[in-house]
A protein has these predicted regions:
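N-terminal Rossmann-fold cofactor-binding loop
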Residues: 30-35, 51-52
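Conserved Rossmann-fold cofactor-binding substructure of NAD(P)-dependent oxidoreductases
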Residues: 43-66
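Glycine/proline-rich active-site loop of Rossmann-fold NAD(P)-dependent oxidoreductases
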Residues: 115, 165-170, 196-205
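Alpha-helical membrane-targeting segments
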Residues: 111, 115-135, 178
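Conserved beta-loop-beta element that borders a ligand/cofactor-binding pocket
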Residues: 143-164
Length: 211
């Protein structure tokens, strides 16, 4: 499958590029600085230098793709619009190019559905008002923009991401969080994302995932 990956130089994006290439996909990685890309260009990996915030600049990367995957997200906990701005730009480029399949990474902090009382009524509200206030608001607006689009989207909602090796063992839930599950390895998250590329049952759904 021909896939385009945004956020390819981040921790999750790096893993996504590596697994996508290793499993035989034809990958276009969109980066601002090619020197930061861990996987070198090759027969299955094309590198395009562009700013994800510029729909016209990323259009060549999206055109002809079977699917787009985004691991773009903010760094740090300060004020940010990275998630929402990149989502709107990607949506515009995809709509102009006629590409419909989008899988993107958000976070479990955005939703309380499926959580137990302690998490829903105490811990998450505190986190959303304090430590992750800006990040959560940004993710929520990105999700709203994606949900309002005409794309065949899937939004991944992982809890805390770790750098542990893939286990191949993870749980998922549709449109609700997994209670009592607090981590997922990036490697397992990426494995799941790639498995959903042509899964119609995951379209227009929020997928929780945890180890």
């Amino acid at each position: 499958m021909k896939i385009t990956i945004f956020g390819a130089t981040g921790a999750t994006g790096t893993c996504l590029v590596e697994q996508a290439v290793a499993t035989g996909h034809q990958v276009t990685a969109v980066v601002r600085n090619p020197a930061r890309l861990a996987t070198p260009a090759g027969p299955r990996l094309r590198i395009l230098t562009a700013d994800v915030m510029d729909p016209a600049a990323i259009s060549p990367a999206v055109t002809g793709a079977d699917a787009v995957l985004s691991a773009v997200g903010p760094r740090g906990s300060g004020p940010t619009t990275v998630s929402q701005d990149s989502a709107r730009s990607i949506i515009e480029a995809m709509q102009e190019s006629g590409v419909r399949r989008l899988i993107t990474v958000s976070g479990s902090v955005v939703s309380d559905i499926g959580e137990g009382p302690l998490m829903s009524y105490l811990l998450k509200p505190i986190v959303r008002r304090t430590l992750l206030r800006h990040v959560c608001a940004d993710m929520r607006r990105a999700e709203e923009a994606i949900g309002a689009s005409n794309l065949d989207w899937t939004i991944m909602r992982p809890p805390r991401l770790t750098g542990k090796a893939a286990t191949g063992t993870y749980r998922t839930a549709i449109d609700r969080n997994l209670p009592g599950e607090y981590t997922i390895s990036r490697a397992d998250l990426v494995t799941c994302m790639l498995s959903l590329l042509d899964d119609e049952s995951s379209m227009h759904r929020h997928i929780a995932i945890a180890n």
